[in-house]
Amino acid sequence: MIDIKLPLTDLHRHLDGNIRPETILDLANQHNIQLPANDLESLLPHVQIIENEPSLVSFLQKLDWGVAVLADLDACRRIAIENVEDAINTGLDYAELRFSPYYMAMNHKLPVEGVVEAIIDGIRSARQNNDIDIRLIGILSRTFGEQACTQELTSLLAHQQHITALDLAGDELGFPGHLFQSHFTKARDAGWHITIHAGEAAGAESIWQAIRELGATRIGHGVKAITDPVLMDYLVENRIGIETCLTSNLQTSTVNSLLDHPLKQFLEKDILASINTDDPAVEGIDIRHEYEIAAPAAGLSIAQIRQAQINGLETAFISDTEKQALRMKAANR
């Protein structure tokens, strides 16, 4: 279902949600960190979704063991490198990897800015001699409150030339977007693009808030947009992209089944919705699964899947010149 003559993108891919289970075991052994299991088979149910979770918050708990083993900055650098390797191995031409430096730092009280530096260095190292375009998106983890987000933002701004965009993720219901308006004003002043997790756990009003108050030009998940026809018209008219994550939305019980997912309706409406992974290691999937299994299960036609692939590049946070270079690369395959 993937058109190899088109660039393959993944715009919504959490670096800290894609820590290999084997790496979790290895780092735990290196740093004498107690895990709930000592072998891969027994560990998997603790770090990967086996059955759909009842909520977003319970889904996010599966990420916690991955960051629990980040005992030093070398570990952070390693997972950045492995994320690029995974992106290459799954056939991506372009990926935007997002990460929350505070979340990655907090278990072992690592310097938050040091985590940012380690991720940047790991990405730079892994990209050498590899034909893949990687951009970084910083995340403010709303779950930890405004003060922690201020610390995250300061650390990200210290390396602003290496960061493409800013995101707000975490407990959407408990920490609504209006709490972080000043953070995103600073991000826009720095020249960053804005993408916001919205309309996943909360309703359409959260998406409106992300656009109007935080300046989002892309929305992560955005499932609840389907409940607001005026919002859907606004998304079309203003070319605001929706970063769809099919399997993730099923596993968080945001939708009851893939056939209930609104992606098909978004595409019929000409909303710039794309197909993305979210947390590949936690979900036990890759981008090919989303295109070849999840998208058809969500009722998408081959033409709609192709359009979603086109939308991925169209809404990527890069210049038109860079997009055209990726198109030429794919066309010549």
UniProtKB/Swiss-Prot annotation:
Where are the catalytic residues? E200
Name the keywords, alphabetized.
Hydrolase, Metal-binding, Nucleotide metabolism, Zinc
Which reaction is recorded as catalysed by this protein? adenosine + H2O + H(+) = inosine + NH4(+); 2'-deoxyadenosine + H2O + H(+) = 2'-deoxyinosine + NH4(+)
The entry marks the following residues as binding substrate, namely H14, D16, G170, D279
User: Can you list the GO cellular component terms from the UniProt entry?
Assistant: cytosol
Positions with a binding annotation for Zn(2+): H12, H14, H197, D278
Recorded family membership: Belongs to the metallo-dependent hydrolases superfamily. Adenosine and AMP deaminases family. Adenosine deaminase subfamily.
Q: Which PANTHER family match?
A: ADENOSINE DEAMINASE (PTHR11409:SF43)
Q: What does this protein do?
A: Catalyzes the hydrolytic deamination of adenosine and 2-deoxyadenosine.
Its recorded name reads Adenosine deaminase
Which species does this protein come from? Photorhabdus laumondii subsp. laumondii (strain DSM 15139 / CIP 105565 / TT01)
- Its encoding gene is what? add
